[in-house]
Amino acid sequence: MSDDWDNNTAAAKTISFGSNPSGFGGGSGFGSGNTGGFGSGNAGGTGFGSSNNGGSGFGGNNNVGPRFGNGNAGGTGFGSGNAGGTGFGSGNAGGTGFGSGNAGGTGFGSGNAGGTGFGGGNAGGTGFGSGNAGGTGLGSGNAGGTGFGSGNAGGTGFGSGNAGGTGFGSGKAGGTGFGSGKAGGTGFGGNSNSGSGFGSGLTNGFGSGNNHESGFGGGKSGGFGGGNSGGSGFGSGGNSNGFGSGGGGQDRGERNNNCFNCQQPGHRSNDCPEPKKEREPRVCYNCQQPGHNSRDCPEERKPREGRNGFTGGSSGFGGGNGGGTGFDSGLTNGFGSGNNGESGFGSGGFGGNSNGFGSGGGGQDRGERNNNCFNCQQPGHRSNDCPEPKKEREPRVCYNCQQPGHNSRDCPEERKPREGRNGFTSGFGGGNDGGFGGGNAEGFGNNEERGPMKCFNCKGEGHRSAECPEPPRGCFNCGEQGHRSNECPNPAKPREGAEGEGPKATYVPVEDNMEEVFNMQKISEGLMFNKFFDAEVKITSDKKPVGVKTCKTFSEANLGETMKKNVAHAGYTKTTPIQQYTLPLIHQGHDIMACAQTGSGKTAAFLLPIMARLIDENDLNTAGEGGCYPRCIILTPTRELTDQIYNEGRKFAYQTMMEIRPVYGGLAVGYNKGQIEKGATIIVGTVGRIKHFCEEGTIKLDKCRFFVLDEADRMIDAMGFGTDIDTIVNYESMPKKENRQTLMFSATFPDSVQEAARNHLKEGYIMLAIDKIGAANKCVLQEFEKCDRSEKKDKLLEILGIDIDSYTTEKNSEVYTKKTIVFVSQRAMADTLASILSSAQVPAITIHGAREQRERSEALRQFRNGSKPVLIATAVAERGLDIKGVDHVINYDMPDNIDDYIHRIGRTGRVGNAGRATSFISEDCNLLSELVRVLSDADQLVPEWMQGASGGNFGASFGFESSVPTQKQDEDCW
């Protein structure tokens, strides 16, 4: 309501009539106005009328009822009170306000900016009407009921309350809201954006219009039934000048989602790249002094004003102290006042002790909060700090039958209905069948009888799942018995939500600047780098040898000057064997299936020639094409590998016109889509997200020239992504294999995968093998610890230098300075080991499929920068990751096949740097014979116990010489 209500007592300047100009029966009339004011009082009543700036104010009263009328800026205010009732009318800026109160009721009417507000109260009821910006608000209260009506921006709001009921109506932006409450019930109606919201109930009703921007608690943050952002509605406003104002209805404005540390958008404070700012010390809420919380405050407890958003204010409806029906009084009889709360809207807070809107349980006036000690009832400390002897507490009883000795879920008695649960009893949310959402009968948040508890396993009654006679339910993920879903060895299935989709991804990554990107993955060549050049190279086409002119240096490759500078800046000095052959072969247009050891530079082997050709031919995706038409699609098996290849591509494309974009699950879909819609010449991503964007038309494959599968054996394997790969290559818009160049790279290529891969390659493709296919990196020293499951934990602690008895570590232990990756098979084990290591003061972190993408990215970041030197990982980290300075890989659990073993140990020993791999293994491991072959291929020592367990004559079985390197020979290799 307008502050102009205070003008009722203004002195007359032009025309004034006083001393009962038209008074009857000993009444008095007052009138004031800049242009004209009228007031009349009859039968001992009092009438007030006020008008300013050409407005008209009319006040009249009969039978001892007060009436107030106020008009400002061309508005008209009418107020009428009869039979002890009170009427308030206010009109501002050409609006019209009508207020009428009869038979002890109260009526409020307010009109602003050309709107019309009607308020009527009869027989002790209260009616509120508010109209703003051409809207119409009608409020009517009869027989002790309360009606609220609000209309804004051309909308219409109707509120009606009868027989002790409450009705709320709100209409915004041309919409209409209706609310009615009868027989002690409550009706809420809200509407926004031209929709219609209807709420009515004999017991309870709740209605909301479009977008849920109005109605109960309407708007973005607004008050009870308020408008957008808390404005212009019942309950809107702040601590003053608000209709029903108070904390909860306060307009908080648009929510700020910026970083708390640097105030920039796009990330949270724990991801902020800026230095952490010191926060101001927190102070006591009661005395505003630092050093303690309000519950421990030695000062006298101060009353909290406007708590829960539904108490006083200082002016406007809802102001004052005391109870009753006075307007804005501040002394006693304040309408909707804070204290006592009798007969006022929101009295005693929102919902007073009696006769107030929402009175009773849910909105009950709790009075001053008791912060005394629970044990001795004295202030100044909590019960756990109490110096008095602990008092015995009464035994807990069953919630259902009130008898001790058992919980309600085990109660043998018939289940009783729980009345008024969730804090809404009697009044606002009240009782069994009255109030907002109360009890058993209809309403918002109603509590229907729950019925008997059912077994979680079989859904039967009479027992709990722990006592169920039926077989236990299988794994939630795969349906098999014997394990839970968090320990499931099978690939995780997406969990569908209400719309048939998984949970929405919200992660938006913060990209590193280019200098950080260049330094992040810069791994210097190690002392064993030349071992790569000792490997035998086989290059064939249709099983026939092929001659190739190799590129011994990057300067010999067909790279532009800008890319050559970027390659040098990235720390590349000499081409590896895989790069020497693929750089010219890809430039010549061949399809390739390439196999080389881990850590030998395969990513650069396909990225450099593809990017150089596209830049040289100026074949780039530009904004003029009207969408994302990538020239190259790179598919990877994991999000982490996608991100790594993306950053590698950023280095090579630096200061060129080429754009490379990552696409993978876990990123916010809207953000990811917005990035690629800007255009991307190269898309690198995981299969699922790329398939999704292709199907919806965001990624258009018509101009795709290069199709790359990294870790191709995993991508094509029948247990991997083979079906989805087939779907992508068979899209109608995807060029046929004869019209595109297909490239496949991996460190392992089983025969079965090679056969399946041929379906995607042109006739005459090149098969390139550096060393033996499936050979381990010779720069990695492979060690084995024979132990059973119960010995693994202690063995791990011993290797990491942790005292098994005291769980302590020497400060100068290598575990703090060297990076270690521990591979496990189950997510639960990863979390368990991380907890154990952390308790021993060893900084450890986990990465597995159950972690959110934000957590996975943060884990890799902390491992890369050394703040967490131990990474415990599942299979998501076993392929492709190129992390600088990994000294040791530990296979806590052995993988299922030899190829995964080779990939795991390949996380160390990169680019000729010496690495170490330790595997915990038992004598019945099914990989023993293959491990013997891998060790022999790498010229490493085979433990005697492994020779015997694998059958002894391993050399003849795999075509190797029967002699095994001696310990001395092995030392010479290192």
Swiss-Prot record:
Entry coiled-coil feature ranges: none
Stretches annotated zinc finger (CCHC-type): 257-274, 282-299, 371-388, 396-413, 453-470, 473-490
Residue ranges annotated for the Helicase ATP-binding domain, each copy included: 583-767
CDD domains named among the record's database cross-references: SF2_C_DEAD (cd18787)
Residue window of motif DEAD box: 710-713
GO terms assigned for molecular function: ATP binding; ATP hydrolysis activity; JUN kinase binding; mRNA binding; RNA helicase activity; zinc ion binding
Signal peptide start-end: none
Composition bias type Gly residues, residue spans: 215-250, 309-364, 426-435
Annotated segments matching region Disordered: 212-435
Superkingdom of origin organism: Eukaryota
Identification of the protein by name: ATP-dependent RNA helicase glh-2
Species, as recorded: Caenorhabditis elegans
